[in-house]
């Protein structure tokens, strides 16, 4: 590459800051004693006269340091331990001041752009397209697999994770912040774990498990949307490829096989151990993080960057639970998209006629709640029968990415059809973390559920290339068609008889087209599952 001009160091620094988007729990610049004790995370963008001279890019008008706004509206009674969890009123227990960016600027120091924008001034609109993994060319498939593996092995250039709760965050001596580096992909796993972990109530006490900041409530779709957007942007930056996009897995096939579980894609089943991935796949070498639940729950520690055992996966292999041995039907998606109301009281896993609860998979595809049902998103996770079916571990299996991009595609189609009607996304009394204006845990800078409740092509810089299945006829419609067909047949017979009576001349026989196609509506007998109200994925 030829270079004819030498750019000033400040411009080079600005370019690098624009290139690396900040989405971490906390930026590395704020993981220090001074920032934690002050409760201020407003890093400089281009400090020209020493530290603290350009917080949030204020000198160039990109942003300013302001007080954090956290939702204070009441949550539901499912969580009775107010004051015990660092995730409450996120992120006020850690920081009370952060950057507020102007215009299309974004990031922890306003050094980058909002989703859908790029360029030094963040004034160039960009749209990436998420496509079906199976529709990609061989080169595109290989590139995606290599990119995932690179993300697994690349230390995040900007972000660190906390390995202790707030009361122990400064270490035993009070001067050693407990943060660690982590890879780009393992950070994706860690954020999911942190959102679903139990609330530690103290040494010798059982941790409280009926809490989940990203499942079983209205924030399920908005939280996972941002989670994916974070990974996509991180990988774009890692690859230096702004057009890179995450593909999806259309799991609504009705089949008992995983069509993306091949060695050139997500890995086939090992011939040596049916619960492992084939050694011919790069993913057989991956090791999981965040698996030491007993340690976290009894000692009050957090998941760190230590990797453990391999990914386990045995699609359709749970012979003891036939209901999870087959993937959702295409028609399940069609029916789900006909549920017009986003969410309904009690805004939990037992909500009925709720689009959110239906696509999450706690209701039947028609929207009717049934405690024995696991459908759509939940069924796809359970079908994988391994790491991908355990809530705290599921993102360790990279199929998680593909499964959730398709779930997000369904969400985006619903938003398009119903004009992003947020009126039934509750402002209060949802499970903790799920109120409309709650800052989603543990993302940084703070971002609310509302900000993700928008159509993606117009607001978030990406779109889906997907063909939705058509609507089958319902039983009542089939009966109506049959009645109409019978009446037409009677009318035709009567007409022919009348003609024969009126005229004895020989006439050519005419064929009357009839509606004789057989339409079968999808139905499946779901087995009752243990703990039906507990989040499985």
Curated annotation (Swiss-Prot):
Residues making up the signal peptide according to the UniProt record: 1-24
Entry binding sites for Zn(2+) B: 377, 381, 404
GO terms of biological process kind: acetoacetic acid metabolic process; melanin biosynthetic process from tyrosine; melanin metabolic process; melanocyte differentiation; melanosome organization; pigmentation; positive regulation of melanin biosynthetic process
Pathway: Pigment biosynthesis; melanin biosynthesis
Cystines in this chain: 30-41, 42-65, 56-99, 101-110, 113-122, 258-261, 290-303
Cofactor: binding comment: Contains bound zinc ions after heterologous expression in insect cells.
Residues reported in the UniProt entry to bind Zn(2+) A: 192, 215, 224
Protein EC: 1.14.18.-
UniProt cofactor(s): Cu(2+); Zn(2+)
Residue intervals on the Lumenal, melanosome side: 25-477
Chain positions carrying an annotated carbohydrate: 96, 104, 181, 304, 350, 385
PROSITE patterns in alphabetical order: TYROSINASE_1, TYROSINASE_2
GO cellular component, one term: endosome membrane
PTM note: Glycosylated.
Top-level EC class: oxidoreductase
Main location: membrane
InterPro entries for the chain: Di-copper_centre_dom_sf, Tyrosinase/Hemocyanin, Tyrosinase_Cu-bd
Pfam families attached to this UniProt entry: Tyrosinase (PF00264)
Membrane-spanning parts: 478-501
Subunit structure: Monomer. Interacts with ATP7A. Interacts with SLC45A2.
Entry's disease: Defects in Tyrp1 are the cause of the brown (b) phenotype. Brown mice have a brown or hypopigmented coat.
Protein name: 5,6-dihydroxyindole-2-carboxylic acid oxidase
Organism: Mus musculus (Mouse)
UniProt lineage: Eukaryota, Metazoa, Chordata, Craniata, Vertebrata
């Amino acid at each position: 590459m030829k270079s004819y001009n030498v750019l000033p160091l400040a411009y080079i620094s600005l370019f690098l800051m624009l290139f690396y988007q900040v989405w971490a729990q906390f930026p590395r610049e704020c993981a220090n004693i001074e920032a934690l004790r002050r409760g201020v995370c407003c890093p400089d963008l281009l400090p020209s006269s020493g530290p603290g001279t350009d917080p949030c890019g204020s000198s160039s008008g990109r942003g300013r340091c302001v007080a954090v706004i956290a939702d204070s509206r009441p949550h539901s009674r499912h969580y009775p331990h107010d004051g015990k969890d660092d995730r409450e009123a996120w992120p006020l227990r850690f920081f009370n001041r952060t950057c507020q960016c102007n215009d299309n600027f974004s990031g922890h120091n306003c050094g980058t752009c909002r989703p859908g924008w790029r360029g030094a001034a963040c004034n160039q609109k960009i749209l990436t397209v998420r496509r079906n993994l199976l529709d990609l060319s061989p080169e595109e498939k290989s590139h995606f697999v290599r990119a995932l593996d690179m993300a697994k092995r690349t230390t995040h250039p900007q972000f660190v994770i906390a390995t202790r709760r707030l009361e122990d965050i400064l270490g035993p001596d009070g001067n050693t912040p407990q943060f660690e580096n982590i890879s780009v992909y393992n950070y994706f796993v860690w954020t999911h774990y942190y959102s679903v972990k139990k609330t530690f109530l103290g040494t010798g006490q059982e941790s409280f498990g009926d809490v989940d900041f990203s499942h079983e409530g209205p924030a399920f779709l908005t939280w996972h949307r941002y989670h994916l957007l974070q990974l996509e942007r991180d990988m774009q930056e890692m690859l230096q490829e702004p057009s890179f996009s995450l593909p999806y897995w259309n799991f609504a096939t009705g089949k008992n096989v995983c069509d993306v579980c091949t060695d050139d894609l997500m890995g086939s089943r090992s011939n040596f151990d049916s619960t492992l991935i084939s050694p011919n796949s790069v993913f057989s070498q991956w090791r999981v993080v965040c698996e030491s639940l007993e340690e976290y729950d009894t000692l009050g520690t957090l998941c760190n960057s230590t990797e453990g055992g391999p990914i386990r996966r045995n699609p359709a292999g749970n012979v003891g639970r036939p209901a999870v041995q087959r993937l959702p039907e295409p028609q399940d998606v069609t029916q789900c998209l006909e549920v017009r109301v986003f969410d309904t009281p009690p805004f939990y896993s037992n909500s009925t006629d709720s689009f959110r609860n239906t696509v999450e998979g706690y209701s039947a595809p028609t929207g009717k709640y049934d405690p024995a049902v696991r459908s759509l998103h939940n069924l796809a996770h359970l079908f994988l029968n391994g790491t991908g079916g355990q809530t705290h571990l599921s993102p360790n299996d990279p199929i998680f990415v593909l499964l959730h991009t398709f779930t997000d595609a369904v969400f985006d189609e619903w938003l398009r059809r119903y004009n992003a009607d947020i009126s039934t996304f509750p402002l209060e009394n949802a499970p903790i973390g799920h109120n409309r204006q709650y800052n989603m845990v543990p993302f940084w800078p703070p971002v609310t559920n509302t900000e993700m409740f928008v159509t993606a092509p117009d607001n978030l810089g990406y779109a889906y290339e997907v063909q939705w299945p058509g609507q089958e006829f319902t039983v009542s419609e089939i009966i109506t068609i049959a009645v109409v067909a019978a009446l037409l047949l009677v009318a035709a017979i009567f007409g022919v008889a009348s003609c024969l009576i009126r005229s004895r001349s020989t006439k050519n026989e005419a064929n009357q087209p009839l509606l004789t196609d057989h339409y079968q509506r999808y139905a499946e007998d779901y087995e009752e599952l243990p703990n039906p109200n507990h989040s499985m994925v």
